[in-house]
Amino acid sequence: MDRLEHTMMFKSQGGDVSPQEILQQVYVALEEKGYDPINQLVGYLMSGDPVYITSHNQARSLIRKLERYELLEELVRSYLQEK
């Protein structure tokens, strides 16, 4: 069979910190530095450029522990569970 006929599945790497915890910690770090956390996170998720995330409290290195799709999965999951 042609490889293009199969759906590719993303698999989480699994780690010691959940995507939810990472997003919360990064959000707080951005707020503490006076940034708009939503705008900064959207900029990072859209571009992949870590410069959108402050290095304050190791937020930049923390958010890079996960792939952007894992962060998006968490955001979508959380949004849909609240509906």
Curated annotation (Swiss-Prot):
InterPro entries to which the protein is assigned, alphabetical: IreB (IPR009309)
Short name of one Pfam family: IreB
PANTHER family noted in UniProt: UPF0297 PROTEIN YRZL (PTHR40067:SF1)
NCBIfam families membership: PRK05473.1
Family: Belongs to the UPF0297 family.
Protein name: UPF0297 protein DSY2420
Organism of this sequence: Desulfitobacterium hafniense (strain Y51)
